[in-house]
């Protein structure tokens, strides 16, 4: 399949293959997981790669602070993906992609202009931010109070959002329905994973869909893949990752109550796609803290850089109006399902075994059941005779 796609002229790579019907709306969602490699291979990789690994998704520094800090986006994409051999000898990253067909309506206006109450519940927001990992300057959980049940019940939720009980929180208006998904997983870097993702998308006719979205977090390698292989798809930054940065910046250097009130204003702007208002408020707050990228100002500086870098992927009101997904919870759920198979305190893989199992797990989690097709075709190829190797005289 990959060879067939790569052999096509560029003009034909977005056409529908023969016998395939293009869906109405699709999304490609990309993320990364973790697994452990056997020590001898990990040490060999550490000797071969003497480059530092950022580990977390790249977060650019505000333009005004570039003189005092290294710009994250200046680093090469392949260096972004180098393994953390200097810090964690065993852990390595794998790439996961979900190609989903979706169903939703196109609306004349934003079907959900008001911020859902789930994002106004302090303990829920704290849990979301903790899971993403951006909590610099945020007070301990004990200083937050849960939203009363009668208030929480008015909100809405998405797949993967923190403890939002189904009985309490209804689905967000306009949220797309997932019809089917195809899963890909590999230990290969984005330079190899990107073409594979595009080839499978082509084979399913996704490039010919009327509405197409590419959803991911802020990792630079995700957007390198999007720009190179899915340039005509609408790029959407995962809302939860953006929320975590805004939450940390709002509370940095403030008392909990004051910071929470600021967060509610800022996250409302973000939800409504009013990114320039949010960016102006962040820059003002950063200046109040004296600028720079150290101390209390660090969380604000990081958020300013993050919003500056991804502001073209944050028009959430327009995305909801088009019925597109605004969160990467579908692929994050798949990453966890893959992790249930490959991660564990006593699970250490060789590179070949890890690659094979990642691909098998991805096929198992795909709705089109490629494993069933494989076994059926394999049975048809069997002759009942055992192949014999010729003996060398």
Predicted stretch roles:
Residues 1-393:
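Catalytic center-proximal scaffold of phosphoryl-transfer enzymes
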């Amino acid at each position: 399949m990959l060879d067939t796609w790569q052999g096509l002229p560029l003009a034909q790579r977005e056409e529908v293959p023969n016998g395939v019907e293009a869906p109405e709306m699709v999304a490609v969602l990309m993320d990364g997981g973790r697994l452990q490699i056997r020590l001898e291979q990990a040490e060999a990789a550490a000797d071969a790669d003497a480059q530092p690994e950022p580990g977390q998704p790249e977060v650019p520094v505000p333009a005004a602070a570039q003189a005092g800090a290294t710009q994250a986006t200046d680093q090469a994409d392949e260096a972004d993906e180098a393994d953390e051999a200097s810090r964690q000898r065993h852990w390595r990253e794998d790439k996961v992609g979900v190609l989903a067909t979706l169903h939703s309506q196109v609306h004349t206006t934003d079907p959900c202009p008001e911020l859902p109450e789930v994002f106004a519940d302090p303990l829920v927001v704290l849990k979301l931010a903790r899971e993403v990992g951006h909590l610099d300057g945020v007070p301990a959980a004990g200083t937050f109070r849960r939203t009363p049940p009668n208030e929480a019940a008015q909100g809405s939720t998405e797949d993967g959002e923190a403890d939002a009980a189904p009985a309490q929180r209804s689905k967000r208006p306009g949220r797309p329905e997932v019809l089917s998904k195809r899963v890909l997983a590999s230990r290969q870097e984005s330079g190899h994973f990107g073409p594979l993702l595009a080839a499978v998308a082509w084979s399913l006719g996704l490039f010919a869909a009327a509405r197409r979205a590419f959803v991911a977090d802020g990792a630079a390698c995700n957007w390198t893949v999007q720009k190179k292989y899915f340039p005509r798809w609408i790029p959407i930054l995962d809302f939860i990752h953006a929320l975590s940065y805004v939450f940390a910046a709002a509370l940095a250097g403030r008392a909990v109550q004051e910071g929470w009130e600021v967060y509610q204003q800022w996250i409302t702007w973000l939800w409504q796609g009013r990114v320039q208002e949010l960016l102006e408020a962040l820059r003002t707050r950063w200046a109040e803290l004296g600028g720079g990228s150290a101390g209390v100002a660090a969380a604000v500086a990081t958020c300013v850089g993050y919003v500056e870098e991804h502001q073209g992927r944050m028009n959430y009101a327009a995305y909801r109006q088009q019925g597109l997904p605004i969160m990467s919870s579908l692929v994050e759920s798949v990453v966890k399902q893959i992790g249930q198979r490959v991660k564990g305190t006593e699970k250490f893989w060789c590179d070949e075994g890890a690659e094979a199992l990642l691909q098998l797990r991805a096929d198992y989690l795909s709705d089109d059941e490629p494993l069933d097709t494989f076994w059926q075709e394999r049975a048809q190829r069997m002759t009942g005779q055992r192949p014999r190797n010729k003996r060398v005289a």
